[in-house]
């Protein structure tokens, strides 16, 4: 059941493609995935040559789903997993990471029950930044000197707001790839209607009864 709760999404697929295209970055590196979900990205990083990997999720079900996947793939000996709230998780304390991956909940919606998903699914608060802001604010303490973070970043988050936030800690972001994906009805129905209206025609598209939303894969490095 836990594995179904965290089924990989189009956002996962975009990060997976990034890992595959940039596999030269992974060998010998210490990798962190913040918000592991199904564990697919963490397992893929190890398969592509990461020396070791750490995974964090606030949901214990995600930690257990990831552990099961790593055991299945014969990778668990090179990984450490922990339940926790972003950077407060015990498993990341005292560490820095060469490569950090993250696909955090980032839609402008609150924690509500959705069929087939936990209440935390996609819930980024009124502006979508409830998790993104503390993640980005703490990133500089855990990213190694020559390290790189790669994250999904949808249109609701506003790229300039992210640049300003990480710029305070001498970091910068660039768009590595852009994707447009269907916006399913269960996600659409839980979104802040004012935010949805604001971005309609500006990263959100409606064609008949179909909705689509744009997101980027961002690379974050030291400036």
Task: Please provide the spans of the model-predicted regions.
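Class I SAM-dependent methyltransferase Rossmann-like catalytic core
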Residues: 1-9
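Short alpha-helical
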Residues: 7, 40, 60-61, 130, ...
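Conserved SAM/SAH cofactor-binding pocket of Class I
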Residues: 11-93, 99-102, 107-113
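Glycine-rich, phosphate-binding/catalytic loops in enzymes
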Residues: 49, 116-119, 167-168
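Mobile active-site "lid"/loop adjacent to the S-adenosyl-L-methionine
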Residues: 101-134
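Conserved Class I SAM-dependent methyltransferase catalytic core
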Residues: 129-187
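Class I S-adenosyl-L-methionine
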Residues: 171-218
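Active-site beta-strand termini and strand-to-loop segments that position acidic
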Residues: 220-223
């Amino acid at each position: 059941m836990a594995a179904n709760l965290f089924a990989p999404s189009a956002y996962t697929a975009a990060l997976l493609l990034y890992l595959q295209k940039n596999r030269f970055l992974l060998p010998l590196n210490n990798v962190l995935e913040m918000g592991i979900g199904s564990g697919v990205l963490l397992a893929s990083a190890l398969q592509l040559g990461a020396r070791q990997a750490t995974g964090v999720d606030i949901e214990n079900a995600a930690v257990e789903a990831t552990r099961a996947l790593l055991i299945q793939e014969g990778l668990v000996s090179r990984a450490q997993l922990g339940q926790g709230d972003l950077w407060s998780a015990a498993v990341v304390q005292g560490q820095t990471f060469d490569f950090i991956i993250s696909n955090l909940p980032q839609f402008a919606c609150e924690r509500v029950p959705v069929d087939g998903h936990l209440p935390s699914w996609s819930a980024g608060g009124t502006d979508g930044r409830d998790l993104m802001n503390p993640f980005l604010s703490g990133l500089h303490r855990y990213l190694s000197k020559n390290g790189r973070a790669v994250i999904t970043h949808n249109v609701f988050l506003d790229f300039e707001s992210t640049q300003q936030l990480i710029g305070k800690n001498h970091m910068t972001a660039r768009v590595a790839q852009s994707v447009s994906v269907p916006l399913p009805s269960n996600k659409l129905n839980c979104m802040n209607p004012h935010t949805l209206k604001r971005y309609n025609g500006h990263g959100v598209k409606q064609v008949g009864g179909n909705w689509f939303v744009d997101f980027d894969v961002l690379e974050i490095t030291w400036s």
